[in-house]
């Protein structure tokens, strides 16, 4: 009703942006007439205006018009009006929902250029190193042309390289590199070791993937912990002897294990221990993890085993997460289950969730093809509003209703039949699967059917060809199996992708012997190019790795002055022209057949991920279609669907190989997905609420560390620590003064011991003092003791006291914080049980976390004061 009265709020917002688009378009002819130099000079004019407090919103129309003209001159790409709208949404610190193929990468350049004019640095975040490098080298040429600097952060870079790249006006990086650099900066011992500048503006590509899907996985830097391999192995053996529903129950919704009374007794019997929960010799966590590994974590679904190592598979992208480990002993339990070497437990040194990390930016924005379904969460946790950007061309994709089968066998047979039909027609098909295991099941089925296909899953041998496989998934007759959203970031072009075909051809021409090459047979142009390239390479002394690097650079659009790379790029352009004409013909045939057909093999727990898969078809107004094939044995229906669906199938007496298309079933499916989304949203919200408590403490500790690093003289800092410690003692003394006759002697003994005073303090004199007099008297003793200690230390080396102050302060803060993180983790694990005592676990957690933090800060002060005042200089002969 409100929408009828007031109209669609999204359309009203777009209407406001269109007015600004008209202003940008009005400047287009003027900027077209400018020379390159004149266009580049506009950057200096904008910077000057902003330094005089010009509002960025007022600069926006001119800055966007300049960036659009520069993009056309440098890349040959002109921003469409809808891309200008996307840029405005990002500039305002919102999320722009833009469909697949609408040019998000190009859109990010507009707000990045505008905001970089302020001089504080803009971060553009992508999901992997490849995309970060591709975008920096390709669209990064636009701000470079306009006089701004562009940086790139990649895995394996040195500290100096990182520092240099973060200092640029616009920096491309990945979410994990950015987060880990933040944590490492807050563990730095020297100010010059810090690589990042203060945060200003961040644009996140695939924002839903990072802020929603990865929100439950904290970034953790850890150090070596205890070695308890035997316990994991023993617990794994015990778990094999425990019987499901007798000794333990599995809660698949919560992904948790509940041990029954008989399970506790049986475990204690097999382990020959009296109490699983004994604090001195705890076994409970080992048994729980062993059972989780047995029941909830499946090989080739949740992880793969490669070279005797358990590697996590990202449940949302299907990619392997090399170097990432499950925490709290779960990873070791899975290693024991798979009978591979169990790595040592680790102790957390620093951690942060993506939720709290990205909230550190004063201005945050993001782009994705699918955010509307998570709008409430993005607004509540990140205060990010989602605005849908209209497509440049009308959407033509047909989304067919789901086909639901009684069992898995009938479903997979039907999928294979559909693939065969499409392949026979010549229509390209992309099949999305939810795990490595299921992708390989379908692959073996298609082999039986004689259907040629490409397989893309988390297995390393497949992942190497990821971009190439996805890029060619739109060719006539192509059949591509991909786990989840593998290949996200690479467009599927109907008829194929001439760039990838040209790159592949260039690789073959450079590596095949002319006399043995079947590739160049009957093609004089390729034969001529083959001979020319091989003669050219012979004049350079270059190994295969170097050649591979030069081919990669030649096939990208970044600037290069290397002679061989320029030659390779020229050859690459010739090959692109050759394949473009071939593709144009094939593209017309594929369009006539109906475009790309996407098959979903299971509904994901999130509607958003289903929409991402569907979104691979019908890009930029192309035709396309999608259909999901489901079975009652699929996890979503089995765990969350309830008995309603099963009863309906039984009532209808449906044959196993006959699918059902039913509005009631579709509603039940959507209801099941909403239940799961609500469940995981609650889990992320709870994680956020608990981590927010730790986050306030983290910010306090990190800001204290930073002030210590930036301070040239920490004398007053240590004296303040000492005075606060003295205050604690005095307050305790005056509380106990009347009830404890010897309290003056006791408190003065402690203070003498703490400060290492070379003389005794008089208890009788002390008892005559008021509280303020006692404080002033002891503060005076602190300064006397400190002056004495400083003169002793500086006898060894002048200025040594200043170095000791910084070293002791950082050392104690870091060690105390490490212990505190462990205590907070233990508190978090145990606090849930308070709910059974009619107490709110979150309030209990906040109260106890505050007590732990207060205790930690007191401990830091006491330890630093003791270390400095009691340190004994050793003079060399």
UniProtKB/Swiss-Prot annotation:
EC class name: translocase
Protein localization: Plastid, Chloroplast stroma; Plastid, Chloroplast thylakoid membrane
UniProt superkingdom: Eukaryota
Gene3D superfamilies: Helical scaffold and wing domains of SecA, P-loop containing nucleotide triphosphate hydrolases, SecA, preprotein cross-linking domain
GO process terms (BP): intracellular protein transmembrane transport; protein import; protein targeting
GO terms assigned for molecular function: ATP binding; protein-exporting ATPase activity
EC number: 7.4.2.8
Similarity section: Belongs to the SecA family.
Name of the protein in question: Protein translocase subunit SecA
Classification of source organism: Eukaryota, Cryptophyceae, Pyrenomonadales, Pyrenomonadaceae, Rhodomonas
Gene name linked to the record: secA
């Amino acid at each position: 009703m409100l929408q009828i009265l007031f109209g669609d709020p999204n359309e009203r917002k777009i209407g406001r942006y269109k007015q600004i688009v008209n202003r940008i378009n009005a400047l287009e002819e003027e900027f077209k007439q400018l020379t390159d130099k004149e266009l580049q000079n506009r950057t200096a004019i904008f910077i000057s205006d902003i330094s005089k407090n010009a509002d960025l919103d007022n600069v926006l129309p001119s800055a966007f018009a300049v960036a659009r003209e520069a993009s056309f001159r440098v890349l040959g790409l002109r921003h469409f009006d809808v891309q200008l709208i996307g840029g405005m949404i990002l500039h305002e610190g919102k999320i722009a929902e833009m469909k697949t193929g609408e040019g998000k990468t190009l859109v990010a350049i507009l707000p990045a250029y505008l905001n970089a004019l302020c001089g504080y640095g803009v971060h553009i975040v992508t999901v992997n190193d490849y995309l970060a490098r591709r975008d920096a080298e390709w669209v990064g040429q636009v701000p470079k042309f306009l006089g701004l600097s562009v940086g790139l952060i990649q895995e394996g870079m040195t500290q100096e390289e990182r520092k240099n790249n973060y200092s640029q006006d616009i920096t491309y990086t990945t979410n994990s590199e950015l987060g880990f650099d933040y944590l490492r900066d807050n563990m730095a011992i020297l100010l010059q070791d810090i690589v990042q500048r203060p945060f200003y503006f961040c644009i996140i590509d695939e924002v839903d993937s990072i802020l929603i899907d990865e929100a439950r996985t904290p970034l953790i830097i850890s150090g070596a912990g205890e070695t308890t391999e035997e316990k994991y192995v023993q617990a794994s053996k015990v778990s094999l002897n425990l019987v499901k529903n007798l000794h333990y129950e599995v809660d698949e919704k919560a992904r948790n294990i509940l041990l029954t009374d008989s399970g506790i007794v049986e475990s204690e019997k097999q382990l020959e221990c009296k109490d699983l929960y004994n604090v001195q010799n705890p076994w409970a966590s080992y048994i729980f993890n062993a059972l989780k590994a047995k029941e909830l974590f499946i090989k080739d679904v949740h992880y793969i085993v490669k070279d005797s190592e358990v590697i996590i598979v990202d449940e949302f992208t299907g990619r392997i997460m090399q170097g990432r480990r499950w925490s709290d002993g779960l990873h070791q339990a899975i290693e024991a289950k798979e009978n591979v070497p169990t790595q040592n437990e680790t102790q957390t040194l620093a951690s942060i969730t993506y939720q709290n990390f990205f909230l550190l930016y004063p201005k945050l924005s993001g782009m994705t093809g699918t955010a509307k379904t998570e709008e409430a969460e993005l607004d509540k946790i990140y205060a990010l509003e989602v605005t849908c950007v209209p497509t440049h061309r009308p959407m033509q994709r047909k989304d067919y209703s789901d086909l639901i089968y009684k069992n898995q066998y009938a479903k997979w047979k039907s999928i294979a039949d559909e693939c065969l039909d499409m392949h026979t027609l010549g229509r390209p098909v992309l099949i999305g699967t939810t795990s490595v295991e299921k992708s390989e099941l379908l692959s073996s089925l298609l082999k039986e059917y004689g259907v040629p296909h490409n397989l893309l899953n988390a297995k390393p041998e497949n992942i190497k060809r990821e971009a190439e496989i996805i890029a060619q998934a739109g060719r006539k007759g192509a059949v591509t199996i991909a786990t989840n959203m593998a290949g996200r970031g690479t467009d599927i072009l109907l008829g194929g992708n001439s760039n990838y075909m040209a790159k592949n051809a260039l690789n073959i021409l450079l590596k095949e012997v002319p006399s043995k090459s079947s590739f160049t047979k009957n093609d004089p142009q390729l034969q001529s190019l083959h001979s020319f390239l091989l003669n050219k390479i012979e004049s350079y002394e270059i190994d295969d790795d170097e050649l591979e690097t030069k081919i990669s650079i030649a096939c990208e659009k970044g600037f290069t002055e290397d002679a061989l790379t320029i030659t390779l790029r020229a050859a690459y352009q010739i090959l692109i022209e050759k394949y473009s004409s071939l593709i144009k013909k094939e593209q017309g045939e594929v369009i006539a057949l109906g475009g790309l057909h996407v098959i979903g093999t299971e509904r994901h727990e999130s509607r958003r991920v289903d929409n991402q898969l569907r979104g691979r078809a019908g890009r930029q107004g192309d035709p396309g279609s999608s259909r999901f094939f489901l079975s009652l044995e699929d996890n979503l229906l089995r765990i969350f669907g309830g008995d309603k669906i099963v009863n309906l199938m039984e009532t209808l007496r449906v044959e196993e190989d006959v699918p059902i298309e039913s509005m009631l079933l579709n509603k039940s499916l959507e209801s099941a997905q909403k239940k799961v989304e609500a469940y995981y949203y609650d889990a992320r919200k709870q994680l956020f609420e608990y981590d927010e408590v730790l986050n306030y403490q983290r910010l306090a500790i990190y800001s204290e560390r930073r002030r210590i690093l930036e301070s040239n003289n920490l004398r007053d800092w240590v004296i303040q620590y000492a005075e606060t410690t003295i205050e604690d003692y005095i307050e305790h003394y005056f509380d106990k003064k009347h009830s404890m006759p010897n309290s003056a002697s006791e408190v003065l003994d402690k203070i003498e011991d703490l400060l290492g005073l070379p003389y005794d303090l008089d208890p009788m004199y002390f008892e005559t003092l008021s509280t303020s007099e006692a404080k002033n008297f002891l503060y005076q003793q602190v300064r006397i003791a400190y002056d004495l200690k400083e003169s002793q230390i500086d006898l060894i080396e002048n200025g040594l006291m200043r170095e000791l102050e910084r070293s002791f302060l950082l050392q104690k803060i870091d060690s105390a914080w490490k212990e505190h993180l462990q205590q907070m983790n233990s508190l978090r694990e145990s606090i849930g049980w308070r709910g059974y005592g009619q107490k709110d676990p979150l309030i209990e957690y906040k109260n106890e976390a505050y007590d732990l933090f207060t205790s930690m800060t007191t401990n830091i002060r006491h330890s630093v004061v003791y270390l400095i005042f009691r340190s004994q200089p050793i003079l060399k002969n």
